[in-house]
């Protein structure tokens, strides 16, 4: 299994995001809300939504890079065949400077592993 994050594994179209927001199921913990929906493909696709309230662009971009990296490096444990949207919660925004990558990885992977159709 390749560890790249290819173009086909990204959610890019507005209609894909809207469909997940409208028809998707959700899981959440103190740091993230994960919305997901079956996509009928043999691989999962990832989208990330970070509000401006999260902080300046550098903070938002850093979080998005971390989430993409977690997805990319852990494809083997994430269920296949889902469109997934990750949304950070306010608590993560407040604690972001004090939380390290490994804590965020653990919290996000716990949610992603619980995805089921």
Swiss-Prot record:
Its EC number is 3.1.26.5. It catalyses: Endonucleolytic cleavage of RNA, removing 5'-extranucleotides from tRNA precursor. InterPro entries: Ribosomal_Su5_D2-typ_SF, Ribsml_uS5_D2-typ_fold_subgr, RNase_P, RNase_P_CS. NCBIfam families: rnpA. RNaseP catalyzes the removal of the 5'-leader sequence from pre-tRNA to produce the mature 5'-terminus. It can also cleave other RNA substrates such as 4.5S RNA. The protein component plays an auxiliary but essential role in vivo by binding to the 5'-leader sequence and broadening the substrate specificity of the ribozyme. Belongs to the RnpA family. This is Ribonuclease P protein component. It comes from Thermotoga sp. (strain RQ2).
């Amino acid at each position: 299994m390749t560890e790249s994050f290819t173009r086909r594994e990204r959610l890019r179209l507005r209609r894909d995001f809207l469909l997940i927001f409208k028809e998707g199921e959700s899981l959440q913990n103190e740091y993230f809300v994960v919305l997901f929906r079956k996509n009928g493909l043999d691989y999962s696709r990832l989208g990330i939504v970070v509000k401006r309230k999260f902080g300046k662009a550098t903070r938002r971009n850093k979080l998005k890079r971390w989430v993409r990296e977690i997805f990319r490096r852990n494809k083997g444990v994430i269920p296949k065949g889902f469109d997934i949207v990750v949304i950070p919660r306010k608590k993560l925004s407040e604690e972001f400077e004090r939380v390290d990558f490994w804590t965020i990885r653990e919290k996000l992977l716990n949610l992603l592993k619980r995805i089921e159709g």
